[in-house]
Amino acid sequence: MRLLLDTCIIAYMALEPDRLSQDVLSLIEDYDNQLCVSMESVKELIVAYRRKGIGRKISKKEEDTTQMIKDGLCIQIWPIREEHIRTYARLTINEAQGHNDPSDHIIIAHAITEHIPLVSSDHKFDFYMKQGLDYICNS
């Protein structure tokens, strides 16, 4: 099974694996599963690096972030394509819960377009299931 991992899951894998639920950990450790991440998540980690946040703990240099994800965590990085942006443009945003993070919206659109489950700890993602998101909650 292919799984799209949200940015927080990448951070937990690299820094705080104890924050991964047993169910999510089992999915990640199953060698039959293909782990993927959106280029948008890579961008978020680089932004975090520049802000001296978690990114600095994940890689020594900003430019090493992609290599760490691919080689260190064995995760494929998927580019954002035009069809992902079209899904993003059609996405109804969860304004009731104040979900205004455009990076989350791109990642959600990526998962919907590719028809793959998105693994995240963000409970606001439930809202997008009625729009086609297959969501696996890390709780």
Model region roles, listed by residue range:
Residues 74-121:
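Active-site neighborhoods of divalent-metal-dependent phosphate/nucleic-acid chemistry enzymes
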